[in-house]
């Protein structure tokens, strides 16, 4: 009966599979997986030897190629347009956005500049004359902003958006209106006379002071001008718009103001107004009918009494609307003010941006620091500036991160022996990876992949951390060359042993990022593609160029030159330790501290029944260790930390050695072999590990339920900035979004009026839609159009009843009556367009509230030309735009009676306001309701879709989790296939995928506890975590697969040889990520640094703790099985002929099995641990008992131990 030895006494038997399997392959009975891997390793061996022979050429050509690609960075384009970054590619939103731009152009109708005022003391009522006075001070300061560009002065009145400027036939009135027509400013000050102070226009009439909105009474002005001009049309226009006395009829906020007009209700009483009462129900612009600002647009944090009366509010908001760059360009094109500056749309955009920046600056400085109120200002340019700042590469962080990596790589590869130190290799490796990252990004720029914030802020650090992992792995393996390896084959032997791991991890990383590109968000798709390309470039650099660097360093070490200062010889080169041969008995060989060479006879046979290859080692070799070095200058370092990369001595009998400090005896390999693996692989430790990881998985599953969808703009903007304060106040108090319901072409609007009204009603009934006041009609073009027709129909009926309009004349009727006359006689027939008999037999709007289809498009032409304020208020944005048609009541020619019909509409929209959207779930609910309303309308033949920022940026969440699960599942399948193909072992690939799936679930759950919301960016990190996790698992799995012995023994050896590279890789990744923690953007810190740091720590724990335990329990059987017997039957074994592997077969073999006699020179390093380590190895061999001392080993020989 056999018993297992203590894990502290585990023997070394980690050997490259290709070398171990060589005799068996030629014996013709090895399984295909090992044969294929051996073939692949042979290719890597040839590649390494070729690079070593031509290392100078490879290094020169590699640096030249990477440097040329890095120059492509000069062509990099940084994208900051939110629509281009976040709208899903190929989605219905993308198609709808394309349709909108195709019909209306690129620019929106206007841009918004906002002021939000809050009290410094939270919860304080802001509805007081004093608070509104401070708001007036800030708004007035902002409205007076002027910028000088191109030799011109630009103020608000020149660049603001003006809604529906009417066309007036009277030239004097037209010029006066052009100068006086007010800007659209949505402000609570419009409830008071002080709102007029924000309007900067003025006009001059002889005998009067300058006319401004602060002293303009339109009714009084019309009375004064009436005797001198025909103003009937203008008067009707003002009456329809319900202008009244404009601002001078409103109460004064400060009745003691010397300019407070006498017509103000509180001018004589001198009493301050009841602010809450005046603001209740909202405010109006100069037109009471078309310019109504609802409470929700002006006030935030409102509180009401039980009767619904407004009592208090905590925030005020004013919004200034400016023209778009295209509108500003068109407005001043050909104007005398811009004829000498080469006016262009780019100049118009520059003017607007300069004004907006100045607006924000002055508004924020308008109130003193000790004021009881605070002003937050924001503009569309501010958002662009934030995105530009967010996308800029921080040179300090990049340089800092790379310097940390350089320092770590250099220190971890230094050694006390100056000639054997590899600090220069570490420096060169990090610099090479940095060049590879730059070349990968340059290649992305050459391929036209745009850069964004994720590229510039994260990718340089992430790619560096990933790329340096393989540098450590290669450098570590290069110094662990098997004794007896010819100098010219060192690089080939290194790639032969580690190339498979590098290929596997790189391919999985590239596959991970390519799978992450399935997320259809342009910014993240670009990031994923760039990451895949950068990983590919670092893979090429590590596999081709870095071996050339190692080969050059090998020459330096062989010549005993100093590290870094390679022109000087090492001072340690004169210290030579001569290892003298010893007089040994038969079969006894000397054992060195660093490695052991023994010559043994091995007999290999294949049993036909089991198809197993069996190697038999006779107990004829005795291993005698010499006295150890008391100062420990020759350290045992089988697979330790990269700071011990040169722990193995060159295979020469004379070698240089510098004495190291006693503390240098400890290293990661020593820790893994003597402390970590024995502790981890004990039965009770395995149980504890499984329980703890099971608990972590269960806790993560609970955390996954806490993850919410969303990404607020406040997460992107740096905390503590004025922009963040504004966005926080806006999100808290004014969560309103302007949206539109767009109707497309492809159906007949004239015959679908009922369906259009039903669509509007369904949309208006959504929970998130802000309803209009009960006293106001819906604000849509179809309602305005119908109401206008009903108004002129009523005027016609009145004129007809009074006889002012007859069958043959309308000149004595009103303007509206004349318009109705012309519409009523239209037939829509090109042959007979007029029919006067219809004057009394038809109506412009029938009893059901529908417009006769034959009049629909002709009436649309008349309405658009005659009611500009109503058209502007409706925000219809018709395409194709109806033709212009001028009405002249006194022109009775037949041509004037003909009304050209508008072309069939292909684009129109109903505006809405969405409120109460705080969480992503609120947005998703509103989007789903809007989509359902459009789907129902589609069944009625109306083609419509919703438009606006909620649908642009939040619709992705409808299918984000589905995309995430799809990408992760596809990636896990791809990882399984790649691992199974390269490892040629589905069993091992399945365990790797199991661990990776656990890592993804746990990362997702920890995100929930950290408060990280699920958006496209965390999805990319989660998907990429599968590929990055391969870095921590595949090395251990491959080491387990290619060693011999029991599962526990193989797991221990896998840990022994991979603990240090995996740990160094994790540290390198963490150092690369460390600089992200210093970002000014909280978004970078939380969503990238925190998430990727957690991912790295999870990978370290799963790769070095959980996976070895799983492998020791569920791992696959060894690929190479060796059995050792006390007295093997030897049939004329051939005599050894030097080192290496030699084999031959006996001429007389039994039919049951074939014997192959092998004479092998076995390189056993590091030195054997106390205890016997040659033991029987069945398919899952038991552990042999341990000996108590190294002397037992030499006395007993390597025979099996039985208990």
Curated annotation (Swiss-Prot):
Membrane topology recorded in Swiss-Prot or TrEMBL: Multi-pass membrane protein
Cytoplasmic side of membrane: 1-57, 414-428, 479-501, 553-686, 985-991, 1035-1064, 1115-1203
One BP term from GO: positive regulation of epidermal cell differentiation
Keyword Translocase among record annotations: no
Location of the region described as Disordered in the Swiss-Prot/TrEMBL record: 1171-1203
Transmembrane feature ranges: 58-78, 393-413, 429-449, 458-478, 502-522, 532-552, 687-707, 964-984, 992-1012, 1014-1034, 1065-1085, 1094-1114
Record has Transmembrane helix as a keyword: yes
Superkingdom assignment: Eukaryota
Glycosylation sites: 370, 812
GO molecular function: hedgehog family protein binding; hedgehog receptor activity; smoothened binding
Family of this protein: Belongs to the patched family.
Its biological purpose: Plays a role in the control of cellular growth. May have a role in epidermal development. May act as a receptor for Sonic hedgehog (SHH).
Record-linked PANTHER family: PROTEIN PATCHED (PTHR46022), PROTEIN PATCHED HOMOLOG 2 (PTHR46022:SF3)
Protein name: Protein patched homolog 2
Species this protein is from: Homo sapiens
Gene: PTCH2
């Amino acid at each position: 009966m056999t018993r297992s030895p203590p894990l502290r006494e585990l023997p070394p038997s980690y050997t490259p599979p290709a070398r171990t399997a060589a005799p068996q392959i030629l014996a013709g009975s090895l399984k295909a997986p090992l044969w294929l891997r051996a073939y692949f390793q042979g290719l890597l061996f040839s590649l390494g030897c070729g690079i070593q022979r031509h290392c100078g050429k490879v290094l020169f050509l590699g640096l030249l190629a990477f440097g040329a690609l890095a120059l492509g960075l000069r062509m990099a384009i940084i994208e900051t347009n939110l629509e281009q970054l976040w709208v899903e590619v190929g989605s219905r939103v993308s198609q709808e956005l394309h349709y909108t731009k195709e019909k209306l152009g690129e620019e929106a109708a206007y841009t918004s500049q906002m002021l939000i005022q809050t009290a410094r003391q939270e919860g304080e009522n802001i509805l007081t004359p004093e608070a509104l006075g401070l708001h007036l001070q800030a708004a007035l300061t902002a409205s007076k902003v002027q910028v000088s560009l191109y030799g011109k002065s630009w103020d608000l009145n020149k660049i603001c958006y003006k809604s529906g400027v009417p066309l007036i036939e009277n030239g004097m009135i037209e010029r006066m209106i052009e100068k006086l027509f007010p800007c659209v400013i949505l402000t609570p000050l419009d409830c008071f006379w002080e709102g007029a102070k924000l309007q900067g226009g003025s006009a001059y009439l002889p005998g009067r002071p300058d006319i401004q909105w602060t002293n303009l009474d339109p009714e009084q002005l019309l009375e004064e001008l009436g005797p001198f001009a025909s103003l009937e049309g203008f008067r009707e226009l003002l009456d329809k718009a319900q202008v009244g006395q404009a601002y001078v009829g409103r109460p004064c906020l400060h009745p003691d103001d010397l300019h407070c007009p006498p017509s103000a209700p509180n001018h004589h009483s001198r009493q301050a107004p009841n602010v809450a009462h005046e603001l209740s129900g909202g405010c109006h612009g100069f037109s009471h009918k078309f310019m109504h600002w609802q409470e929700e647009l002006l006030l935030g944090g409102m509180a009401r009494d039980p009767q619904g009366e407004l009592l208090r509010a905590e925030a005020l908001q004013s919004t200034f609307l400016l023209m778009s760059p295209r509108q500003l360009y068109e407005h001043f094109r050909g104007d005398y003010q811009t004829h000498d500056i080469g006016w262009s749309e780019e100049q118009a955009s520059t003017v607007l941006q300069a004004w907006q920046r100045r607006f924000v600056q002055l508004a924020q400085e308008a109130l003193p620091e000790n004021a009881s109120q605070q002003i937050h200002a924001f503009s569309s340019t501010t958002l662009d500036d934030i995105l530009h700042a967010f996308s800029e590469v921080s040179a300090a962080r990049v340089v800092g991160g790379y310097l940390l990596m350089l320092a770590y790589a250099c220190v971890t590869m230094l050694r006390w022996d100056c000639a054997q130190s590899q600090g220069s290799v570490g420096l060169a490796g990090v610099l090479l990876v940095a060049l590879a990252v730059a070349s990968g990004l340059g290649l992305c720029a050459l391929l036209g992949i745009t850069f964004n914030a994720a590229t510039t802020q994260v990718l340089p650090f992430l790619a560096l951390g990933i790329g340096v992992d393989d540098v450590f792995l290669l450098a570590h393996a290069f110094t662990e060359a098997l004794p007896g390896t010819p100098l010219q084959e060192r690089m080939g032997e290194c790639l032969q042993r580690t190339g498979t791991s590098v290929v596997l991890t790189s391919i999985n990383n590239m596959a991970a990022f390519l799978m992450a590109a399935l997320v259809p968000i342009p910014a993240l798709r670009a990031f994923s593609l760039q990451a895949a390309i950068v990983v590919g470039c670092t893979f090429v650099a590590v596999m081709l160029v870095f071996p050339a660097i190692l080969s050059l360093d090998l020459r330096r070490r062989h010549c005993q030159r100093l590290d870094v200062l390679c022109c000087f010889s090492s001072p340690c080169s004169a210290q030579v330790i001569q290892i003298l041969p010893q007089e040994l008995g038969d079969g006894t060989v000397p054992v060195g501290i660093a490695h052991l060479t023994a010559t043994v006879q091995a007999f290999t046979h294949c049993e036909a029944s089991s198809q197993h290859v069996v190697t038999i080692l006779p107990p004829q070799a005795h291993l005698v260790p010499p006295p150890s070095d008391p100062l420990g200058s020759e350290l045992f370092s089988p697979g330790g930390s990269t700071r011990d990369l040169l722990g193995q001595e060159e295979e020469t009998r004379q070698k240089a050695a510098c004495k190291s400090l006693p503390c240098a005896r400890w290293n990661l390999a020593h820790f893994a072999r003597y402390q970590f693996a024995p502790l981890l692989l004990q039965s009770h430790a395995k149980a504890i590990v499984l329980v703890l990881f099971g608990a972590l998985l269960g806790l993560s599953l609970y955390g996954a339920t806490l993850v919410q969808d969303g990404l607020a703009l406040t997460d992107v903007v740096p905390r503590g900035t004025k922009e963040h304060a504004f966005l926080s106040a806006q999100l808290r108090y004014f969560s309103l979004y302007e949206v539109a319901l767009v109707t497309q072409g492809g159906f007949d609007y004239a015959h679908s009026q009922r369906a259009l009204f039903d669509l509007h009603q369904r949309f208006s009934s959504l929970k998130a839609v802000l309803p209009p006041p009960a006293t106001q009609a819906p604000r849509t073009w179809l309602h305005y159009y119908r109401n206008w027709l009903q108004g002129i129909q009523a005027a016609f009926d009145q004129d007809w009843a009074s006889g002012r309009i007859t069958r043959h004349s309308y000149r004595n009727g009103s303007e509206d009556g004349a318009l109705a006359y012309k519409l009523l006689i239209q037939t829509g027939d090109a042959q007979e367009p007029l029919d006067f008999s219809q004057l009394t037999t038809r109506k412009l709007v029938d009893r059901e509230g529908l417009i006769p289809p034959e009049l629909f498009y002709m009436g649309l032409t008349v309405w658009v030309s005659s009611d500009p304020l109503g058209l502007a208020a409706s925000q219809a944005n018709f395409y194709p735009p109806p033709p212009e048609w001028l009405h002249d009541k006194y022109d009775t020619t037949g041509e004037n009676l003909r009304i050209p019909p508008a072309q069939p509409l292909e684009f129109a929209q109903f505006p809405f306001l969405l409120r109460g959207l705080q969480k992503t779930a609120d947005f998703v609910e509103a989007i789903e309701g809007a989509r359902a309303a459009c789907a129902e309308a589609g069944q009625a033949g109306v083609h419509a879709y919703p438009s606006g920022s909620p649908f642009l940026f939040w619709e992705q969440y409808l299918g984000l989790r589905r995309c995430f699960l799809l990408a992760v599942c596809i990636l896990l399948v791809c990882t399984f296939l790649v691992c199974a193909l390269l490892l040629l072992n589905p069993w091992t690939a399945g365990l790797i995928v199991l661990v990776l799936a656990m890592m993804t679930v746990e990362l997702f759950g920890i995100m929930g506890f950290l408060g990280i919301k699920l958006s496209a960016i965390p999805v990319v990190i989660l998907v990429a975590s599968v590929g990055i996790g391969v870095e921590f698992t595949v090395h251990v799995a491959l080491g387990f697969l290619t060693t011999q012995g029991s599962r526990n023994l193989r797991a221990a050896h896998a840990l022994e040889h991979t603990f240090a590279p995996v740990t160094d890789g994790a540290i390198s990744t963490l150092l690369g990520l460390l600089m992200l923690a210093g970002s000014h953007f909280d978004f970078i810190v939380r969503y990238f640094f925190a998430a990727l740091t957690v991912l790295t720590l999870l990978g370290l724990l799963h790769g070095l703790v959980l996976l070895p335990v799983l492998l020791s329990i569920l791992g696959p059987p060894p690929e190479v099985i060796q059995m050792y017997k006390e007295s093997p039957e030897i049939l004329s074994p051939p005599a050894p002929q030097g080192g290496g592997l030699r084999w031959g077969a006996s001429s007389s073999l039994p039919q049951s099995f074939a014997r192959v006699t092998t004479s092998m020179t076995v390189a056993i390093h590091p030195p054997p641990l106390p205890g016997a380590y040659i033991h029987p190895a069945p398919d899952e061999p038991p552990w042999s008992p341990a000996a108590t001392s190294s002397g037992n080993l030499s006395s007993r020989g390597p025979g099996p131990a039985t208990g």
